[in-house]
Amino acid sequence: MDVLLANPRGFCAGVDRAIEIVKRAIETLGAPIYVRHEVVHNRFVVDDLKQRGAIFVEELDEVPDNNTVIFSAHGVSQAVRQEAERRGLKVFDATCPLVTKVHFEVARHCRAGRDVVLIGHAGHPEVEGTMGQWNREAGTGQIYLVEDVEQVATLQINQPENFAYTTQTTLSVDDTRGIIDALRERFPAMQGPKNDDICYATQNRQDAVRDLAKRCDLVLVVGSPNSSNSNRLSELARREGVESYLIDGAHEIDPAWVAGKQHIGVTAGASAPQVLVDGVLARLAELGATGVGELDGEPESMVFALPKELRLRLVD
C-alpha cells in the first residue's frame, strides 16, 4: 500500500492571512482578542488560537464595548460593520480579498439597480456576508440566493433583462458551472463577472483531487465538517468513482477503510494545516503504507498583505 499526496493542498493565501492576523493582533495588543465567527473553518486551528488568547463569538453583542474584534475570512455584512463602528470597536478585517471582490461586485450591481443572483449555500457565513452587501436603500433591484439547478427552474426575477450573478468562492466548480448554464438558458441577458468568483485555491485543489482520483482507490480529505471547500473535495472524489472520507485528523481513520487498498490519496482543504496531514501520513504508515509520493500540481505563490498595523512583529 502506498500514499499519494495531492498538490496543491492545505492552506491558501486567504487562510494564511486570516490566521496571521489573529496571531499578530494577540501578539501586538495582548489577549484577549475577540474574533467574530471561527476565523477559518478548522477545529485544530481554532483550538490553537483559543490557547493563544482568541475568544470566538458569533455576534458582536458578545464583544465588550471599546474592545478589538477580528472579522473572519468569510466576511461580514455591512450591518455588522456598521454595528462595530457604532460601538467603538477596533476592527481588523481578515476577510479574504477574493471574498471582498465578490462583495464589491454585489454592491456595484446594487447601485446600478440590477437584480443579483448569488449562487451559494444557505447559512454559510460567506453567503450571509455577501447577501449583506445589498443595500435596499441604494438601489431598486433585489438579491436572490440559488443553491442548485432545481431552484433555477422556479426562480422568479423581477428584472430578467437586467440582472447579474455572483458566486460563493468555495463551491464545486462543476456544480456551479451547471447552475450558471441553467440560469443563462432561462435568462439569456444575464451578466456575470469578468473572471470566475470561485477562487484560484478552490479550483486548484479540486483539479488536484480529480487527478488523484484517477490514480487511487481511496481518497482521504483532511478538513473539518463545517469547511465548505473540504466537503467539496470529498464529494468530488466520490463523484469521480472513488471511495472518499472527510476527516478532521488521523484519529478518525477507520482501519477498515484502508484494508485491501493499493493506492491511498491524501489531500487537505484550504483551511487544514500541514501538521494534520503529517499526522495522517504517520497513521497510514502504522496501518501498512510503505511509501509516499506527491503529484505535480499548479504552483501557488499568491500572498495577501496584512493590515499595516500588524505588519511589524514585536521583538522580545
Curated annotation (Swiss-Prot):
Gene3D superfamilies: 3.40.50.11270, 4-hydroxy-3-methylbut-2-enyl diphosphate reductase, catalytic domain (3.40.1010.20)
Cofactor comment text: Binds 1 [4Fe-4S] cluster per subunit.
Protein residues bound to isopentenyl diphosphate: 41, 74, 124, 227-229, 271
Organism, scientific name: Stenotrophomonas maltophilia (strain K279a)
Keywords: 4Fe-4S, Iron, Iron-sulfur, Isoprene biosynthesis, Metal-binding, Oxidoreductase
Name of the featured protein: 4-hydroxy-3-methylbut-2-enyl diphosphate reductase
Keyword Oxidoreductase: yes
Family membership noted in the UniProt record: Belongs to the IspH family.
Binding annotation for (2E)-4-hydroxy-3-methylbut-2-enyl diphosphate: 41, 74, 124, 169, 227-229, 271
